[in-house]
Amino acid sequence: MSFAREAGRAIRSTLVLWVITALIYPFSMIAIGQILFPWQANGSLITNNQGQVVGSALIGQPFISDRYFNSRPSTTNYSTADPKNDPNKVLQTGISGASNLAPSNPALIDRIKGKPDPDPAKAIQGEIPRLEKGAIKPTAALVYTSGSGLDPHITPEAARAQIERVARVRGLPTNQVEILVTKNTDERFLGIFGEPGVNLLKLNLALDAIANTR
């Protein structure tokens, strides 16, 4: 068999595979996603009552106000930064990850328990003292960071620990806030995989929706 014939066969095979893998397959997946799962395929975006996109159900956001259920700590601050001071281009490229600190690491212990210092700029408040100051029982999800730093969920236990504070600050009945927590809790996938989690963005938007109807 001549070299030209072998080369021609190789070129044809390459072109066929290229058309299948680079054109037919990806565009088929895009079409299937847009037809069957349009919300998920477009990023699971969440809008407010005005129709404005406020985030994604898959990406967490930092919530620290007493009026809201607070998010869990994040080593990347949920990939947020000051638009006027962003030398690492976090807002442009995004960033995720964990601290990977060992349980015995002093930096992790200081972040959790706090570290007083005569110089206020060097003092570390600590997650546990911050929670106790707000009359919130510390739970693992409110003290430790997640592996990605972008987790959109907190545990039902972490949400329940904040119910009284949120209800008090907003002047809402405790049972009404409890119902919101239950409604915004995602159960185990297929009933067996993973653990239940409360989607924080959905829950806090539901709180604002109540405030707008009062």
UniProtKB/Swiss-Prot annotation:
It is a single-pass membrane protein. The keyword Iron does not apply. It is found in: Cell inner membrane. It holds the Pfam family KdpC. GO terms for cellular component: plasma membrane. Its main location: membrane. The keyword Ribonucleoprotein does not apply. InterPro entries: KdpC. Keywords: ATP-binding, Cell inner membrane, Cell membrane, Ion transport, Membrane, Nucleotide-binding, Potassium, Potassium transport, Transmembrane, Transmembrane helix, Transport. GO terms for molecular function: ATP binding; P-type potassium transmembrane transporter activity. The chain crosses the membrane at residues 17-37. The system is composed of three essential subunits: KdpA, KdpB and KdpC. HAMAP family: KdpC. Part of the high-affinity ATP-driven potassium transport (or Kdp) system, which catalyzes the hydrolysis of ATP coupled with the electrogenic transport of potassium into the cytoplasm. This subunit acts as a catalytic chaperone that increases the ATP-binding affinity of the ATP-hydrolyzing subunit KdpB by the formation of a transient KdpB/KdpC/ATP ternary complex. Belongs to the KdpC family. NCBIfam families: kdpC, PRK00315.1, PRK14003.1. This is Potassium-transporting ATPase KdpC subunit. The lineage of its organism: Bacteria, Bacillati, Cyanobacteriota, Cyanophyceae, Oscillatoriophycideae.
